Amino acid sequence: MEKLVLEPVTRIEGHAKITVQLDEEGNVKDTRFHVMEFRGFEKFLQGRRIEEAPRIVPRICGICQVQHHLASAKAVDACFGFEPEDIPETAYKMREIMNWASYVHSHGLHFYFLAAPDFIGGKDRETRNIFKIIQDSPDVAKQAIELRKNAQDIVAATGGRAIHPVSFIPGGITTELDKETQEKLLKKAKRNVEIAESTLELAIPIFEDNMDLVESLGTIETYHMGLVKNGTWDVYDGVVRVKDKNGENFAEFGPDEYTKYIAEHVKPYSWLKFPYLKELGYPDGVYRVSPLSRLNVADKMPDAAPKAQEYFKEFRNKFGYAQQPLLYHWARLIEMLAAAECMASVLEEDLSGKKIHGKLERQEGEGVGIVEAPRGTLIHHYACDKNGIITKANLIVATVQNNPAMEMGIQKVAKERIKPGVDVDDKIYNLMEMVIRAYDPCLSCATHTVDGKVKLFTLEVLDSEGNVVKRL
């Protein structure tokens, strides 16, 4: 019996590998997605003061830092007895602006730097990278950098700094915007609307040219989950909506109810858990959270995003209730445009209000904060004692919730492509990686080698006793 090992999985945030177990005839017996790093932030939080949590958790990730900051702040809000409507209006809007800016930054990073090389990069692994895109299309590369810089400038202005922001506090925010700064940010937001729309116009024909791959690669049927507010796409507030495999509403629940619906399965070969819908059990209750999931569960895009609404309608008409992982890229770009439009719309409003946080009253209790991170639904759940010391912390991040689906997707690719007598080459490995990349997993703050000069994978052949007999 042989085992094929793909390590590392490239162009993702973090460290992971894929193993494919073959039977005696050379057919695929099992496929696993391994995450080898251990973070332990839930333990780090225990014993700390509850108001410190929003300053600690952005260190979980350098990409979706804003969403950890925000989910934590919402959980701490709840611990202090604040409801979303209790947050001062200016603070609420500022929180949304930073969240949307982070979406533009993250989605832009993923498309241009991590995903696009599979579609518009080189044909072999040495040229399938961002540097090939820079060489062939320098104007596109400059546009990608401008998009991300504009978004990060807005995060810095609203969050106190661009990396690991600090401005969200219990009951509000610490940052104020003067009129001059607001006007500068509005120009950046409007420019990002233009870039986001041009990115869609660039990408859609490319996706359509690869529709055979888009329709088939790693496609599985699962439930989908995401926030909606009165049925509308929302990434900050609302209720969690779950739709079944056929696109019918399965459940809707608020933050405090998530434990009634979500449970977690554990497997010995990965630090990631395998969440599922409690009522259905594992694996029948496997669900996904993602840009595609958010479009699947939403009835429409926000009124502040009319351009994104048009792309959303076209997408829904073309694909209906979509299950294909490679459509995540298309959905991600629709969201990037929506976030840019919403951000520009709010930056045109009056943000001069001086009341930016509420009055705190210490209390013992629990709080749950749910937001939509770029990669999907993010849950922070804290409990604190009468002295405001954290006694329990539970974090359910988007990549964890997508973990079962990612593994199912690569198993489907492996069984379709790896057959007895077939030479397992770089193209097959990259197809499995493409499924993983579609989910944009965020496993840590690091991204693997993308320049093509370092060896991108190691193939180990093991005997039936697990001994390495060949390393390629």
Curated annotation (Swiss-Prot):
Ni(2+) binds at C61, C64, C442, C445. Its EC number is 1.12.99.-. The keyword Metal-binding applies. It comes from the Archaea. SUPFAM superfamilies: HydB/Nqo4-like (SSF56762). Its cofactor is Ni(2+). Keywords: Metal-binding, Nickel, Oxidoreductase. InterPro entries: Ni-dep_hyd_lsu, Ni-dep_hyd_lsu_Ni_BS, NiFe-Hase_large. GO terms for molecular function: ferredoxin hydrogenase activity; nickel cation binding. Belongs to the [NiFe]/[NiFeSe] hydrogenase large subunit family. The F420-non-reducing hydrogenase is composed of three subunits; MvhA, MvhD and MvhG. It forms a complex with the heterodisulfide reductase (hdr). Part of a complex that provides reducing equivalents for heterodisulfide reductase. This is F420-non-reducing hydrogenase subunit A. It comes from Methanothermus fervidus. The gene is mvhA.
